[in-house]
Amino acid sequence: MTAAPLKVAFAGTPEFAAAALEAILAAGFEVPLVLTQPDRPAGRGMKLSPSPVKQLALAHGIAVDQPSSLRGEEQRATLAACAPDVLVVAAYGLILPRAVLDLPRFGCLNIHASLLPRWRGAAPIHRAIEAGDTETGITIMQMDEGLDTGPMLMKHAVPIGPADTTGALHDRLAALGAQMIVEALRRLPSGELVAMPQPAEGATYAGKIGKAEAVIDWQCDASSVARAVRAFNPFPGAVASLRQVPLKIWFAEPVAGHGEPGTVLVADADGIVVACGTQAVRLAQLQKPGSRRLAAGEFLRGFPVSAGERFEAAAR
């Protein structure tokens, strides 16, 4: 006799999590409850907007709870009432107390976008690109009370290409995470998934991205600047100010060149070449306030730039 599919409660908020929820539903698992962050102001009108996970859950007729904390008895009772076999967590944004971790029969599984223990924390994709890592991946882990410190059940690596942005890598990892969590849920009841403790060495922390750190520091070497531009694409977008106008930089590549950091060396249809602490970068896609992203040639027609001009230094 075939065992009934697991009853899976789900906790997540952004698109990364929605991909996993969609895969879980498509695989036929019963999802009695979805937890997601409260609606947040978004868009030009700053109207309250539901998370991608909430939108997906409502479209499937699934009950949604949006607590600001899981530490209260009422929130735990809501989860307990649906009697889940397992709680799947993906980019949820709230801390799970011990009482919640212990509630499901098979505990809580987390989909984390790095090869743990490297890049524990809120922004593993950004930080992997920014640091120049050549690979990252997905780890499915059994959650404990620490920050991404629980034992690992599954792990799969993917390469980081030289042109990968956080946006592109996010989409690949979201698809991989969705595939892996379905496999994990299918294998979980049999006990064949072996929980491996994370290594004591190699742990790093992927701190939340602040808009201030997206300001380009021209004193850095060209490779670091180019990686930062890729890491902060699409959020929050790397920023550099010229003539006191904040410009978003969406694509940059290291090139030969030298000069005072921040100085424009060349400005033509191929791009704006700017000196860095070591070598230079070519800015090939830019955006001024109130406009759209433009290739360098088109950008320069509306915002002329000359060799010798200098971008403002990043605040220290």
Swiss-Prot record:
GO terms for cellular component: cytosol. PROSITE patterns: GART. InterPro entries: Fmt (IPR005794), Formyl_trans_C (IPR005793), Formyl_trans_C_sf (IPR037022), Formyl_transf_N (IPR002376), Formyl_transf_N_sf (IPR036477), Formyl_transferase-like_C_sf (IPR011034), GART_AS (IPR001555), Met-tRNA-FMT_C (IPR044135). It comes from the Bacteria. GO terms for molecular function: methionyl-tRNA formyltransferase activity. Disulfide bonds: none annotated. It catalyses: L-methionyl-tRNA(fMet) + (6R)-10-formyltetrahydrofolate = N-formyl-L-methionyl-tRNA(fMet) + (6S)-5,6,7,8-tetrahydrofolate + H(+). (6S)-5,6,7,8-tetrahydrofolate binds at residues 114-117. Its EC number is 2.1.2.9. It is an enzyme of class 2 (transferase). Keywords: Protein biosynthesis, Transferase. Attaches a formyl group to the free amino group of methionyl-tRNA(fMet). The formyl group appears to play a dual role in the initiator identity of N-formylmethionyl-tRNA by promoting its recognition by IF2 and preventing the misappropriation of this tRNA by the elongation apparatus. Belongs to the Fmt family. PANTHER family: METHIONYL-TRNA FORMYLTRANSFERASE, METHIONYL-TRNA FORMYLTRANSFERASE, MITOCHONDRIAL. HAMAP family: Formyl_trans (MF_00182). This is Methionyl-tRNA formyltransferase. It comes from Aromatoleum aromaticum (strain DSM 19018 / LMG 30748 / EbN1).
